[in-house]
């Protein structure tokens, strides 16, 4: 791991220097909550996922999901599982990271990200990419996020009124209809008046008027768009001390893995870093085993999986591995991941999920990861 100024800089200071809106928000959130913990919520049902997000949300800054392994996932855009997670994220102050590991040609990954039944981009603040197919996958995901964001420059509010006018009103409107342009109100809204009537009979008599429907559309600026959809009427809960997360989306590049025998070479990792530098408006950082910031203006964040703590009665400062799971995963302590390797966020799954008290264990991991960060600043 190369020495870099970000290793000795507080999250609060880094939040002011970074140019990515979502990275800045995440760093401020980490400082506010004194947490650099991500929960890998690999559970089989939507009910369990939402329960964990609600109970452990106060201890974490990122919730990592795998929507395609969750049975009972509700795809409704307003009231489904993704929308409920977004509501819990606002309530407890964390970001949602869908661990999709996109790994296909650019056109395909853009569609997987922005469309389909899940519409990941609508509810996940962060996604990641396996860059084996090449840099085009990063460029296409960035393009998809940019196009999606462009659809939110303003809010459209539509009102419809229906009424039955008097005959005198209709006479006035008919006399003027050939001379006046379409009605436009003061704020630029289009007002379309559509009379519904039987027309004139052959002898020139007017038919009866049924009604007039007025449709008004107002286009109001949304300079600071947010995920405004709520689960229930009046649900305005928001984590105190910080505004709602920006609508900007972010990408993590899978640069290194914690699994034994993986094929991510140094050459591949370097290509990931280069791609990140080319798309700094979208790429937040990396899934990696160490800090990859080397150039002076690199300000990427790093998230590292495979974090596990020894039992409470053992040394928490161990610098080595603490075993594996027998299926290739290799574990390291928070002290090793954050304090020595220079990562920013520790990703923890089974270490918390399999504990007798997951909420209490999440606090233990949060405390250990934060301590490793603060000690790194002083080193």
From Swiss-Prot:
PROSITE patterns the record matches: OMPDECASE
Pathway annotation: Pyrimidine metabolism; UMP biosynthesis via de novo pathway; UMP from orotate: step 2/2
Disulfide bonding pattern of the chain: none
Region (Disordered): 165-198
E.C. no: 4.1.1.23
GO molecular function, one term: orotidine-5'-phosphate decarboxylase activity
Enzyme class: lyase
Any Gene Ontology CC annotation: cytosol
Residues annotated to bind substrate: 42, 64-66, 99-108, 331, 350
SUPFAM superfamilies: Ribulose-phoshate binding barrel
Cross-referenced Pfam families: OMPdecase
Stretches that traverse the bilayer: none
Stored InterPro entries: Aldolase_TIM, OMPdecase, OMPdecase_AS, OMPdeCOase_dom, RibuloseP-bd_barrel
Keyword vocabulary terms for this entry: Decarboxylase, Lyase, Pyrimidine biosynthesis
Catalytic residue list: 101
Family: Belongs to the OMP decarboxylase family.
Protein's recorded name: Orotidine 5'-phosphate decarboxylase
Species whose genome carries this gene: Hypocrea atroviridis (Trichoderma atroviride)
Upper taxonomic lineage: Eukaryota, Fungi, Dikarya, Ascomycota, Pezizomycotina
